[in-house]
């Protein structure tokens, strides 16, 4: 009977984790460039049950040996196997701000994605789809969290002008004179990136993504005065939250039923009236 407790509890924990993930997605529905997390549930490995029985050998003095009798497999619950961002393209929203950029995917291999490159506080590179940038007091292009946006040579971008133009290939023009080009990084398998908070991603330890500019196998463009919306589907997310709640509630009722059965077994079975 205790096995039923463990199975139902595993289901409750999995649905609670799923609900937390969906709630986080919904709270970031209006965050530019946010990529929704998605989870996958997996059943624990099945257990093969067998019954130990005794069999006798007909001799002058009967001998008994233990014999296994197959009962069958039993499931032991589920768990959240994996959580990974979904890197599908978000919708474009015009803002009219010169420092707002959005990457529009055109031709990319399956599972590949491109990102803006920024410099983290420790000097390492991070990658983001949130192009809601600004200029600091020194004229450097930064994220809203103060991280420097990098060009294709991994240098900080300083704009010594109040107005500038960004071409679709990422070239930054001041008074129609090319100054630098945005650093756009290519992840051949975006699923291998590690989420780092605040809309940032990082590559595996000691690795950097390759430069996406001038790559003949891919195509994309940078849109100035636009930001990419999050790819969270609010309606579907709310429906999934309802489903997760119902599953959590069902497992909770199973535990209550087991609890009542155990109370009855402890208090009534074997009682002499």
Predicted regions and their residues:
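Amphipathic alpha-helical polymerization modules
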Residues: 1-273
């Amino acid at each position: 009977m205790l096995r039923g407790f463990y199975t139902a509890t595993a289901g409750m924990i999995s649905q609670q984790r799923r609900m937390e993930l969906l709630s986080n997605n919904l709270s970031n529905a209006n965050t530019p460039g946010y990529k929704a997390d998605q989870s996958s549930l997996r059943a624990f490995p099945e257990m093969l049950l067998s019954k130990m029985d005794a069999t006798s050998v007909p001799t002058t003095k009967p001998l008994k040996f233990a014999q296994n009798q197959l009962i069958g497999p039993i499931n032991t619950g589920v768990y959240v196997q994996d959580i990974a961002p979904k890197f599908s393209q978000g919708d474009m929203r015009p803002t009219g701000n010169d420092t707002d950029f959005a990457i529009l995917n055109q031709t990319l291999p399956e599972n590949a994605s491109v990102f803006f490159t920024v410099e983290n506080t420790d000097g390492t590179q991070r990658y983001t789809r949130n192009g809601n940038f600004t200029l600091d007091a020194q004229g450097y292009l930064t994220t809203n969290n103060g991280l420097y946006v990098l060009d294709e040579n991994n240098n900080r971008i300083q704009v010594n002008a109040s107005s500038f133009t960004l071409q679709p290939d990422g070239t930054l023009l001041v008074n129609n004179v090319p100054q630098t080009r945005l650093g756009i990084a290519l992840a051949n398998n975006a699923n291998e990136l590690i989420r780092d908070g605040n809309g940032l991603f990082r590559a595996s330890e000691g690795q950097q993504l390759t430069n996406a500019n001038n790559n003949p196998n891919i195509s994309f463009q940078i849109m100035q005065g636009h930001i990419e919306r999050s790819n969270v589907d609010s309606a579907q997310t709310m429906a999934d939250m309802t489903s997760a709640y119902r599953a959590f509630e069902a497992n909770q009722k199973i535990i209550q039923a087991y609890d009542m059965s155990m109370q009855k077994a402890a208090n009534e079975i074997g009682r002499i009236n």
